[in-house]
A protein has these predicted regions:
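Bacterial N-terminal signal peptides that target proteins for export
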Residues: 2-15
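C-terminal motif of bacterial Sec signal peptides marking the signal peptidase cleavage site
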Residues: 23-26
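Short Fe-S-cluster ligation motifs
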Residues: 95-118
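C-terminal partner/receptor-binding element of secreted or periplasmic proteins
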Residues: 115-142
């Protein structure tokens, strides 16, 4: 028995094919993205490839480190949230200090990672965490 045209499974399948086509279309781009270092503030975007509407947005940070005036069972960490956009397709990812970077077909073989010399701002007290979490990242062609 065939499923109706508007069935949820069929719509999900069509959406998945469109997503894959959008991300893989970046593979056809002839030029690599340049190696570069960027310093970004929260909610700041970079336009990486205007002809493809490829951008990277630093959304913000999640800080689970122990505040200075608290006792914690585990040390926690800072994780930086990003969104890669190509045309109308979005892909969210996280970068964490000391962990591998991020790659995607949309990045044309490039890798995004936190700069090794970058230190997160101090966590501060419970009531007064850092006002903002700037980030320094590197993009490397592979």
């Amino acid at each position: 028995m065939r499923s109706p045209i508007g069935s949820p499974l069929r719509l999900v399948s069509i959406a998945a094919v469109c997503l894959a086509a959008g991300l893989l279309s970046a593979c056809a781009a002839p030029e690599r993205l340049p190696d570069a270092q960027y310093t970004l503030s929260e909610r700041q975007s970079l336009l990486l490839a205007p002809e493809q509407r490829l951008s990277l947005t630093y959304e913000g940070a999640d800080d689970t480190r122990c505040p200075d005036n608290a006792r914690c069972m585990a040390p926690g960490r800072v994780a930086y949230r990003f969104t890669l956009r190509i045309q109308n397709v979005e892909q969210a990812f996280w970068l964490v200090p000391g962990k591998p970077g991020f790659t995607s077909p949309a990045l044309r073989g490039a890798r995004v990672e936190l700069d090794r010399s970058f230190d997160a701002p101090a966590r501060g007290m419970i009531e007064a965490g850092p006002v903002s979490y700037p980030v320094v990242l590197n993009m490397y062609g592979t």
